[in-house]
Amino acid sequence: MDLNNRLTEDETLEQAYDIFLELAGDNLDPADILLFNLQFEERGGAELFDPAEDWQEHVDFDINPDFFAEVVIGLADSDGEEINDIFARVLLCREKDHKLCHILWKE
């Protein structure tokens, strides 16, 4: 993989959010979708992190933080606070030539 051919942080967030919106209808309860849509403007967000350790339990490849990012999408108690109602955790490859993502959905 090429360090010079990675998505920027903003591109990573945007791509993860687009994937979330595309797949949410098939993976979240209708009540959660309604809540997310009603509250996202005021309390919603997407935050970028290095991949958490527990991803190794869900995928069978090496998660190099230089090439993978975790995007947490959900709602916070109020604007500016950390997301505490997580609707999806998206593991995304940041290398532009390797389209790979894995999502852990709210249960």
UniProtKB/Swiss-Prot annotation:
Family annotation (InterPro entries): dsDNA_mimic_put (IPR007376), Put_dsDNA_mimic_sf (IPR036763)
Annotated coiled-coil segments of the chain: none
A matching Pfam family: DUF440
Source organism, top-level taxon: Bacteria
Function: May act as a double-stranded DNA (dsDNA) mimic. Probably regulates the activity of a dsDNA-binding protein.
Family: Belongs to the putative dsDNA mimic protein family.
NCBIfam families: PRK05094.1
The protein's name in its UniProt record: Putative double-stranded DNA mimic protein YPO2187/y2032/YP_1985
Native source species: Yersinia pestis
